């Protein structure tokens, strides 16, 4: 992505929250040392728990630092939170992280409502809005649109992004954001699509729309966009893909933009295969021109590598017992399917 002057010419965070039917008070397990400690329920609490049924001694969900998930996955939540903190420790600038793992139900959010210049990750929004527009008009993508979309996503071509941004129009782009529930996202004005203001919370909502059945994007649209995101040129496939194990497929869109304050480096992606099904978004403002583009990329990858390790280790550990758990509690499968429609609780993002 070039300088701002070039731009003028050119995902649901699932918080793992389960509705409680309890009429009684929530209880908390004792605290234990280490990353696998069970959070106490407290007014100040850095960790909270919610009872799944009235009088139940076992909380349904537990929050550990930045991450929330099922009680049985509290160690994973704690490990992910610790690894995110470690990855960002000592790094210059401002950062935001969001992730969701469908297999374990664990989600994490750091600085979720902070606004960042989108740079080229807005191209994923442009693509999704184009596909939604064709769903509404019941028309197929033209050969020209397919060519432009391919260049925009796989090569991050700015001219193609400008062409499609102009074709869709601001009204249709905003309509898509409204349908997606991406209320914190503010479209760039005067054609400056790369200055669209995005949040880690909303980027996860977008990734959610691309990876599970929903009323906004149909199966064809989801498959088409993910197919393009899986073909991003190797020179632009850095970021949240770092540490992806063999056998797991990635679908990514990155963005990079320098200005007087420093480099803006963003990376969003979804991952599937070998029972894996998760998504990660990392946004960053370096806020120091002494730090180059690679510094921002390194920051994102310092977060992505341990997160990839944690999630894939959890998938391998849990896959052998998943069938037995679902057979013993068939309502769990229903909960996983319907939970995708839940918009996570988050304070209204500050407008900036």
Where would I find each of the regions flagged by the language model?
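Short helix- or helix-capping micro-motifs
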Residues: 150-152, 180
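Sec-dependent N-terminal signal peptides
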Residues: 2-15, 25-28
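Penicillin-recognizing serine hydrolase domain
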Residues: 55, 59-95, 100-104, 164-352
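C-terminal region of N-terminal signal peptides and the immediate post-cleavage residues
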Residues: 17-53, 72, 316, 322
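Active-site SXXK
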Residues: 105, 115-139, 152, 280
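Acidic/histidine-rich, surface-exposed loop or edge segments in extracytoplasmic proteins
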Residues: 55-70, 106-111, 127-130, 154-158
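Short, well-structured active-site flanking segments
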Residues: 132-150, 173, 221
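A short glycine/serine-rich beta->alpha loop
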Residues: 110-116, 189-192
